[in-house]
Amino acid sequence: MYEAPFEIHVHGEIPLRSEVVLAQVQEALKPIWVYAGAKSLASAARSLYEEEPGIRFSATDHVLSLCWTVAGDEDFRQAVEDACMALNEIASEGAPLEVSFYDIQFDEDKASSDEESRDDFMMCFIGPTPAAILQVQRDMMVRDVVHMMERHFDAAELDPVVQAIDQLFAGRYESLVLSMQLGKPPKGSGGGPGHGGGRKPRHLH
C-alpha cells in the first residue's frame, strides 16, 4: 500500500475581489482538492489535523483562508502552482502562500548522523497583476531584512537598505514591463522553493 512521504501544510490569506463567489473559489482550488482525492472543495476543506481551520472562504470579508494539511508527495508542487495561477484571476491584491513539506518517515531520535530529513518549504505569490505580486514580494523582503538587521542597527540606520531593496524591485518591474511589451517571458520567477536549516514547527492556529 502506498504511503505518502510528506505531510504538506498550506498556509495563507488571499484577499479576493468582492464579486467572487464560492463556485469560482472551488474552480480555482480544483487542482489541490482533486490532488487530495476529493470530489469537491467542501469534502476536502478539512485538514488532516482537527486543530487547523482548513480551507475557508468568507463571502462577507472576501477572503480565502488556508491553514490546511494534506498527505502527499513532491508532485503537490505542480498542483499548488496550478491553483495559484487560477487564484491570480480572482485575487484583489497580492498575497503570499506558504507551503511546507514535512518528512513523516524521518525520525530525529532514530536517525544516524548522516541522515537528513527531506523537509522543504516553498513560497508562492498570488496577485491580480505582476505589479501586485512584486509589491508583496518587496514588502516581505523589507520586513525580513529589517527584522534581522534591527538586532544590530537602529531602525533609522536601515533607510539606505530599504531604498536599495526598492531600487532592486523597481528594476525588476521595469524589466517585467519591457518584456511584456516585447512579448517575451519575464526574467526571474514569481516565487519558488526556499531551503532552511532544521525542522520547522507546524503552523497551529
Language-model region placement:
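Generic alpha-helix signal with a bias toward terminal, lower-confidence helices
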Residues: 22, 26-28, 41, 45, ...
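Short, solvent-exposed aromatic-acidic interface loops
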Residues: 27-35, 102-109
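Generic alpha-helical propensity signal that fires on short helical segments
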Residues: 26-34, 84-86, 117
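Charged interaction segments
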Residues: 44-205
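Short, extreme N-terminal segment that most often corresponds to the first beta-strand
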Residues: 1-33
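A common structural junction motif
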Residues: 30-40, 88-95
